[in-house]
């Protein structure tokens, strides 16, 4: 992939592993602290990055409005309607002309709306992600606390940088952990930037967010349900609550990544595993958002080319009914996540859920071809 980072940009390369038994790991050496330090220091944006942040806000709003009347989105709104904000402030909901609600519930409702059609931005590396999932919780918090547009933009930039750096350096799916485990700490870091919180508070927020967001990938296997849209929205809500608790002075489990009973040791590669995470060096402006990309079609990112192929075959008037067998030569990710390599018989069932079929290369090709 072509990176849009500028020549000469400096990064800090962080080696992350389980710390030795019987030894304490100073917080300044912990990944969560380094993320928090980056978040607290982020205070300026390049002009082209500012434009891209605007693009991502527009894209999120568009896909949310497209999904606004789908049942999972309506039900998420109903949950938020139970938590109107009693004072001045609060956050708005997609699909409602008025009213403000507690930001954590607005984040949930709006997060489901953005995620429902699987049509917002994407970033694939060692793991998978939709970094635009960070925007609904950040926007909700910004509305409730009255943040400026600049502070919101800086928060979004930090969240993208954090999530995409984690996705580049730490593979979750090989251990059947869902990618919301990278999303929640990214949201916490972004809120920290937007609210000008101290490193200590952001650090505790990142720890708690990750601790609570380590879900399995069953949400994306077998009979896939609307929880696929709720999972990132719930992670955003969790991050908001973590920040609220940390602001009151409460502490969280640490070292969350490197601890002997932490995430790496027991949920990822184990006590002997080492991961490399790259964050902007001190004084460097985050730019990872420039490496995210949007979709043309409402389906898994790896299905975009398959849909185009199906349309092309349809245009050539090749009758699908006369085809006995189709071989798709594709990537490892496509084969195992949306192809026959997934081992999910549900992906071959035309009556399966929408969430299942938008992750089925077989179904997607057939529909586009027809």
List each model region and its residues.
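Glycine-rich phosphate/diphosphate-binding loops and the adjacent beta-loop-alpha structural elements
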Residues: 288-298, 302
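Short, Lys/Arg-enriched N-terminal segments with co-localized hydrophobic residues
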Residues: 1-10
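N-terminal core-entry segment
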Residues: 9-290, 341
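Intrinsically disordered, low-complexity Ser/Thr/Pro/Gly-rich interaction regions
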Residues: 14-19, 301-370
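Aromatic-acidic/polar surface patches that form glycan- and anion
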Residues: 127-130, 180, 299, 354, ...
């Amino acid at each position: 992939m072509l990176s849009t980072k500028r020549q000469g940009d400096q990064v800090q390369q962080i080696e992350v592993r389980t710390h030795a038994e019987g030894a304490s790991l100073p917080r300044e050496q912990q990944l969560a602290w380094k993320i928090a330090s980056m978040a607290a220091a982020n205070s300026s944006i390049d002009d082209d990055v500012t434009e891209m942040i605007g693009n991502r806000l527009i894209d999120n709003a568009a896909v949310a409005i497209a999904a606004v009347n789908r049942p999972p989105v309506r039900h998420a709104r109903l949950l938020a309607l139970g938590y109107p904000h009693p004072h001045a402030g609060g956050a708005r909901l997609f699909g409602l002309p008025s009213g403000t609600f507690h930001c954590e519930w607005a984040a949930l409702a709006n997060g489901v709306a953005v995620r429902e059609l699987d049509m917002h931005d994407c970033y694939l590396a060692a793991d998978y992600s939709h970094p635009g999932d960070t925007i609904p919780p950040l926007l909700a918090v910004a509305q409730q606390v009255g943040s400026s547009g600049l502070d919101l933009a800086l928060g979004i930039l930090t969240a993208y940088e954090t999530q995409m750096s984690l996705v580049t350096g730490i593979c979750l799916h090989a251990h059947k952990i869902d990618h919301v485990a990278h999303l929640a700490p990214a949201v916490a870091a972004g809120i920290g930037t937007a609210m000008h919180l101290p490193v200590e508070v952001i650090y505790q927020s990142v720890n708690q967010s990750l601790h609570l967001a380590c879900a399995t990938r069953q949400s994306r296997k077998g009979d896939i349900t609307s929880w696929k849209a709720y999972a990132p929205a719930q992670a955003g809500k969790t991050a908001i609550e973590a920040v609220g608790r940390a602001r009151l002075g409460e502490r969280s489990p640490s070292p969350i990544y490197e601890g002997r009973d932490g995430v790496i040791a027991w949920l990822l590669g184990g006590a002997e595993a080492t991961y490399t995470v790259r964050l902007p060096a001190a004084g460097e402006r985050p730019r990872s958002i420039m490496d995210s990309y949007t979709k043309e079609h409402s389906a898994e990112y790896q299905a975009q080319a398959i849909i185009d192929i199906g349309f092309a075959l349809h245009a050539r008037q090749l009758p699908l009914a006369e085809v006995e067998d189709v071989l798709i030569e594709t990537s490892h990710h496509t084969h195992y996540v949306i192809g026959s390599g997934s081992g999910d018989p549900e992906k071959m069932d035309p009556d399966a859920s929408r969430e299942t079929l938008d992750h089925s290369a077989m179904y997607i090709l057939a529909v586009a071809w027809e």
